[in-house]
Amino acid sequence: MIYRLVFIALLISVLPSCTHEFSLNEVDAERKIVLFCMPSTLGDTTLIQVARSRVIHNQGTNTDSKPFLVFRLNGEEKEIHYTEVFTGLLPARSYYVVEKLKENDKINMEVSYPNLPVAKSQTVIPQAFPLDKSEVVLTDGEYGKKIQFRIAFTDSAEAEDYYGMRVIKKTSTAFFQPENSDSDTIKYTSVDLNLDNEPLFSEKTGFDDIFDISKEYYRNLYIWDDSKINGKNYTLKVDTYYDAGYENEERKETIEFKIYLYKLSKEMYTYLKSLNRINNNDLGGYGLAPIRSHYTNVENGIGLLGGCNVYESEWISNPKE
């Protein structure tokens, strides 16, 4: 169960903080429904976060009216649950559906509030990530040893495909003396991968090339499309610094990795790409480039309904020298 909790926490982290209000500062903006939902094949719980935008210049009072939600899976309406408090698995004041999803499942959603147009959206769970083989190996780097993640996969030539990758590092510290066992710890962190030698990520154009600006990926979720590899077999290679862990007379620290590979719907890929553009738009803050906005696929609203098919590896031991 802890692995599912880690994944849901990571999934939530790529979404904006969503409470009862979402501010819009455009002078001509109107209140809109805000919907964020990212159905996936991992686990059986689909989180739904719903709110209403609040126009900053509008000084009117807010109401406590509840939204009305409809969640249809392949045309069949499903029961929607609600939690008022944080559960350890779900955020406070969030909705959720308990249903195991699979590839090609079609999800339609509707959200309505009094005096607001009904917000609608839809998505489809993509086919599975076409993984052929994954490896975690120790290699020589410019400044010492490094860990390289190699992902071999076969892209389909029949459609446009969208992918993602994220690596989680687990650091476990265990004390040898029984009286210190309560101090044992486990820490999970997302891995900041070096992309410089991977052609799918490292190409720079325009201002990025002129000013040698490196692209960063929001929350270390690395995404790409198949425009360079359509219909081909390909091995993606990315790396990070080598942390050997340690062991002494008192304690032992061990390192493990878990790889998440995503097949993304076009909607979800486009949304994540817009997040990356916004976070990398340093020049926009100086008036040298246009300020970009978030992508949305919610009709009469704001937000995202985007599906993904997730591959989750087992925990992989740290390579040894």
Per-segment meaning from a language model:
Residues 19-321:
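A sequence/structural signal for flexible, mid-protein segments enriched
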Residues 2-8:
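Sec-dependent signal peptide recognition
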Residues 1-2, 19:
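N-terminal hydrophobic targeting signals that begin at the initiator methionine
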Residues 14-17:
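C-terminal motif of bacterial Sec signal peptides marking the signal peptidase cleavage site
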